[in-house]
Amino acid sequence: ISEEIMVGAAAGAAMTGLRPIVDLSYSTFLYMAMDQFINQVAKSRYMFGGQASLPVVFRSAMFYGLSTAAHHSDRPYPMFMNVPGLKIMVPASPTDAKGLLRTAIDMDDPVLSFEACLLWGMKEDIEDGEFRIPFGVARTVRQGTDVTIVAISSAVPQAVLAAQILETEGISAEIIDPRTLVPLDSL
């Protein structure tokens, strides 16, 4: 398996009019394709003066907290957040995963989706049919007046538990889930 070739081939396919969705498995393996991500995927629109778009979605899973060792436990999204040209999504629920993925597929920019495997077993009712969740629009998970907790991905359920504990101590906690890190909702 060569992540560098997978990313490069997807970039080429996107430049020719396709909208590939690439599953790169573990997010740790994204490092193997850094040259393609940084120098090709992220910069193509800029290098061609806006005449080329790169409508491609790269999915990767974050397996932290499951004793998967060093090679399967990274969360590299902070590095990618600092690369101009990339959009970053971190869904925390099945509804967000579906709505954000539909939006990502429609975008003309490259999107990296970081999915926490701890959430894969989560169940909830999801709206039938097509719907989209716009990038850069946070979700208020819980209203509160005393403190705000900002959490992403699998930290959102943990934040809900923390807010419930705080509530027993008379502290009202608001929980915000940004859903996308690039663009980040300015609230």
Predicted regions and their residues:
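Conserved thiamine diphosphate
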Residues: S2-I5, A11-V150, S154-Q158, A173
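Generic long, charged, amphipathic alpha-helical segments
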Residues: Q164, T168-L187
